[in-house]
A protein has these predicted regions:
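N-terminal active-site segment of His-dependent metallophosphoesterases
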Residues: 1-58
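Active-site neighborhood of phospho(di)ester-bond hydrolases with catalytic His/Asp-centered motifs
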Residues: 6-7, 32-37, 59-64, 124, ...
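Active-site neighborhood of divalent metal-dependent phosphoester bond hydrolases
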Residues: 55-113, 141-158
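Internal, conserved structured core segments that host functional sites
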Residues: 105-141
């Protein structure tokens, strides 16, 4: 089974379209896993959501921006750690978000667990400690971003029972293998530091 991983589209429709066109043209990808933060930062929210919710080969989870924006939509407490930098922007996104996407966004899970080729695979936007998996976004469940190295990854995801952990959030491509678990971040589709849209 071959699958593709996309994450952190952040409202960048052109980048998303480029990546999905490449995936579709390959004709050897069975499934796409979308690791969240589809909205926020970029302005093409509804075009992005229309494109991803229209596909039947994609499973997705929520990222911190998705949840924070929906907290504005739902009138629930907003996370303090994002207030200074993103609150006004998230209000703008929420004000332009088509109501037809509310239910689907509110129902996105925080993680997906699969067994693929005999290996336990965890898809998650970023580490959330097991005792915070059901905490609301204003309780800041996502762990602080750590340095991209093997030791930091091992400590960060120490509570997770998986052979392969696939995540996004920090927009940087990296892969580490500590002999017990493998950690893979494909980089951000919509906020890559280079001129190309990336996926895994």
């Amino acid at each position: 089974m071959k699958f593709a991983i996309i994450t952190d589209v952040h409202g960048n429709f052109d980048a998303l379209e480029t990546v999905l066109d490449d995936i579709d043209n390959r004709e050897d990808i069975d499934k796409i896993y979308n690791l969240g933060d589809n909205i926020g930062i970029g302005h093409e929210t509804n075009k992005v959501l229309d494109h991803i919710f229209d596909r039947d080969d994609m499973e997705m989870i929520a990222g911190n921006h998705d949840e924070a924006i929906m907290s504005v939509v739902n009138g629930t407490p907003y996370p303090d750690d994002l207030k200074d930098k993103f609150y006004e922007h998230h209000r703008w996104i929420a004000g332009h978000l088509d109501e037809e996407y509310y239910e689907e966004l509110n129902q996105l899970p925080r993680y997906i667990e699969k067994t693929i080729c005999g290996k336990k695979v965890l898809f998650i936007h970023y580490e959330i400690a097991n005792d915070k998996l059901s905490s609301s976004i204003d309780e800041q469940p996502f762990s602080p971003i750590v340095k991209d190295d093997e030791n930091e990854m091992t400590q960060l995801f120490a509570d997770k029972d998986a052979d392969l952990i696939i995540f996004g959030h920090n927009h940087r491509l990296h892969m580490f293998d500590d002999k017990n678990k493998m950690y893979f971040n494909p980089g951000a589709v919509g906020l890559n530091n280079g001129p190309h849209a990336v996926y895994g």
